[in-house]
Regions:
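RecA-like P-loop NTPase motor core
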Residues: 1-44
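C-terminal accessory helical subdomains adjacent to catalytic cores in phosphodiester-
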Residues: 15-19, 36-44, 51-163
Length: 163
């Protein structure tokens, strides 16, 4: 199972990885993602870092393993769970991916301001999904890294970024 904190995260996982929608569960906030993850085995949680917010106490049960492309990878050994933290948050991460891929957000009717971007993708998830497909066509390294980790962990219980 993959636990995420918002519908945009759910769309991200569904679009970039070969994961069925029923294998992705939307939880109301990062605390709930972590609680669900700690009750499950061999699962993945995806949350935003949100550096200005306080860290949930459950985060202490996960060990930091590696960081790559503004993704932080954590591991919880007792239940064999993976936690992926998107830094600083999904909106900024995707905007940066678009800049790196030389994708004009205006061509997807999306703003480059993270707050406005957040509001728009939550009102019209299709625009966000179209952007994700555009990033994948350009073989964006951020999305490919996240995809590789999710798919490998679900299939083999192994993420190359935990080593």
């Amino acid at each position: 199972m993959i636990y995420v904190e918002c519908k945009a995260d759910k769309s991200l996982v569904h679009v970039i990885a070969d994961i069925r929608p029923y294998e992705i569960e939307h939880c109301p906030g990062k605390n709930e993602v972590l609680k669900k993850l700690l009750k499950d085995k061999k699962s993945i949680g995806i949350i935003d870092e949100d550096p200005n917010a306080s860290s949930p106490p459950e985060l202490k049960k996960f060990k930091s393993r590696k960081s790559k492309l503004s993704l932080k990878f954590y591991y919880e050994e007792s239940n064999n769970n993976l936690l992926i933290i998107i830094c600083p948050n999904l909106e900024n991460w995707i905007i940066e991916a678009s800049i790196e891929g030389k994708i004009n957000l205006n061509s997807y009717d999306l703003p480059s301001n993270p707050v406005d971007f957040h509001n728009i993708i939550n009102l019209n998830i299709t625009k966000f999904q179209n952007l994700l497909h555009g990033l994948l066509k350009k073989e964006n390294e951020r999305l490919l890294t996240l995809r590789e980790c999710i798919e490998n962990y679900i299939r083999n219980g192994n993420c190359p970024h935990l080593r």
